[in-house]
């Protein structure tokens, strides 16, 4: 079921035609939904909702300027909030007590060099077992570079700060099965222990599968053997949230030159 457009320029002061993109969400202790997004020329901003469908902008900027892009929020075991962000050549992070005021963590979480990529983006995390987490990431989609040629990898951590790259590739060139371009991966741990990875597939040549949002499935979170088109044409930057009702909602980005992201 489509719920339409939630946020678009001129929300948060974004200029018409510019991106308001990369949504990431979390359920707060009071049951509300907070959505963070990248606002072109402004930084990482946030909005809140009682039902996950109608959002009210929150004042201020969570992370200003060009310090961060493509955010992913994660609730730490101690209750604090962390935003993992893309900085082209590295993934960095910012931590907050209240989800509103963030302080940059020292160092980086993972570099593009360590991941074997020319540039890195879209960190997204799932807890694979108690005290062990896996981060998925992909090649950074650079404006003007054209579609195709993206691949997704992963890394693991026991403290959510230091990440070790998993051997091989999950999706894209070099992966054992699903070798089409794949970007902006987002993992969902299903009740049976399988991992569903949602991602954007945009081909460099016409024909074949349609462009848009796909879902791949893996028994171990490392080898993905099956994929299916979600029907969301040209959808990208997915975030899947389980609402307090138990339903799941997919937030994703789109772009219209007359409007923006």
Predicted feature descriptions by range:
Residues 1-261:
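Carbohydrate-active catalytic/glycan-binding domains of CAZyme proteins
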């Amino acid at each position: 079921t489509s719920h339409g457009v939630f946020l678009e320029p001129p929300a948060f002061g974004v200029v018409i035609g510019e991106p308001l993109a990369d949504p990431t969400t979390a359920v707060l202790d009071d049951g509300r939904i907070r959505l963070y997004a990248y606002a072109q020329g402004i930084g990482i901003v946030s909005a809140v909702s009682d039902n996950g469908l109608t959002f009210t902008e929150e004042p201020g900027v969570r992370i200003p300027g060009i310090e961060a892009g493509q955010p992913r929020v994660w609730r730490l075991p101690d209750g604090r909030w962390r935003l993992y962000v893309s900085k082209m050549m590295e993934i960095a992070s910012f931590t907050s007590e209240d989800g509103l005021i963030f302080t940059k963590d020292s160092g980086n979480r993972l570099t593009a060099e360590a991941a074997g990529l020319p540039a890195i983006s879209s960190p997204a995390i799932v807890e694979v077992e108690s005290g062990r987490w896996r981060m998925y990431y992909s090649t950074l989609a650079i404006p003007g570079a054209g579609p195709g040629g993206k691949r997704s990898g992963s890394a693991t951590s026991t403290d959510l700060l230091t990440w070790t790259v998993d051997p091989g590739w999950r999706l894209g060139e070099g992966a054992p099965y699903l070798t089409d371009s794949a970007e902006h991966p987002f993992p969902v741990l299903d009740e049976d222990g399988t991992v569903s990875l949602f991602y954007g597939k945009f081909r460099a040549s016409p024909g074949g599968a349609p462009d848009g949002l796909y879902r791949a499935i893996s028994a171990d979170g490392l080898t993905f053997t099956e994929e299916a088109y979600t029907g969301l044409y040209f959808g990208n930057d997915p975030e899947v949230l389980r609402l307090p009702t138990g339903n799941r909602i997919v937030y994703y980005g789109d772009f219209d030159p007359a409007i923006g992201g």
